[in-house]
A protein has these predicted regions:
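Conserved N-proximal alpha/beta basic substrate-recognition cap immediately N-terminal to
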Residues: 5-109
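A short beta-strand motif that forms the metal-chelation/ATP-contact edge
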Residues: 54-58, 176-178, 235-247
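Short glycine-rich anion-binding loops that position phosphate/pyrophosphate groups of nucleotides
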Residues: 62-64, 134-135, 244
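Rossmann-like NAD(P)H-binding beta-loop-alpha module
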Residues: 108-128
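Phosphate-binding site of ATP-dependent enzymes
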Residues: 139-220
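A long amphipathic alpha-helix within ATP-dependent nucleotide-binding catalytic cores
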Residues: 193-238, 242, 250-279
Length: 280
């Protein structure tokens, strides 16, 4: 069988980045795959020359040119992990949380608004967590308890506001990572300031948390993802689902990801679809 070709659409990583992805690319090449960096390349893209040239594309970047290129490749029939539609959906918390609710995933009460003032009545029932409706990584998250704090929330009239009921955590947040149906748990603090905070403490997820994580993956038909869970009063609440996160704290993450992507590329080359059988 010919060597699988895998193209990566990635963020711009700084030289001292601790991301696993450059190491995953190296591991795939060592395993015999032909690995190319499709984005970033530092040059203009001639859209007429965009065509499917790889058995599999790995979409790690959730915005900008990389996401748009993934959309173009998707329309041309490319196999992408995670798929362009799923990645675009997960980028929008308003859309993704309605999907999670419909799938029976436990989430905090969730609200969308056009202006901070519209959220004021919700404070009567307790604090809110206000966060950007797009993006991730814990950026721009605020716990709002008063009208004054709500008025201080940065506001762009061209973008909606996204808010959830705040539930005080029983302890550290539970980060559940899934690699092709394999479930890994890491306890993490928020906000994460040090490398130790980012790697957290591995733990074995209880069956309830495993089931929640798998249900999240099935809701979006994704193979590589992370689920943020806050446990409050013994009740788990999903507060975020991310496409292809950093997998920090997962033992042997580089090799696990490389093996999964290599197998997915082989399946895609045979026309069988890139997703693992666990979620197909």
């Amino acid at each position: 069988m010919s060597r699988p070709r895998i193209g990566f659409l990635l963020p711009h990583y700084p030289r001292r980045s601790t991301s696993h992805m450059p190491l995953v690319m190296r591991a795939l090449a060592d395993a015999g795959a032909i690995v190319d960096l499709v984005h970033p390349t530092g040059r203009t893209v001639d859209l007429s020359q965009v065509r499917v040239e790889h058995d599999l594309y790995v979409l790690r970047k959730m915005s900008g040119l990389a996401l748009s290129l993934a959309g173009a490749l998707h329309e041309l029939g490319a196999a992408i992990i995670n798929s362009y539609p799923a990645t675009a959906t997960l980028r929008d918390k308003i859309v993704s949380f309605r999907i999670l609710q419909a799938a029976g995933v436990p989430t905090p009460a969730t609200f969308a608004a056009s202006h901070p003032d519209e959220l004021l009545p919700q404070l009567a029932d307790g604090p809110l967590v206000v966060k950007p409706y797009q993006g991730g990584g814990g950026h721009g998250i605020r716990v709002v308890r008063t009208a004054a704090e709500l008025a201080a929330v940065p506001y762009d009239r061209h973008k909606p506001l996204f808010a959830q009921r705040y539930h005080a955590p029983d302890g550290r947040d539970r980060k559940i990572y899934v690699i092709g149906g394999r479930v890994f748990g890491v306890k993490k603090v928020f906000p994460r300031r040090t490398d130790a905070d980012k790697h957290g403490e591995p733990f074995t997820p209880a069956p309830e948390l495993r089931e929640i994580a798998v249900r999240c993956g099935c809701a979006f038909d994704v193979d590589l993802y992370g689920v943020d869970i806050v446990e409050s009063g013994g009740q788990p609440y999903v507060v975020d689902v991310g496409s292809i996160p950093g997998f920090k704290g997962v033992a042997d993450a580089v090799q696990l990801l490389a093996r999964h992507l290599y197998a997915a590329a082989e399946r895609a080359a045979r026309g069988e679809g890139a997703l693992s059988e666990v979620l197909s």
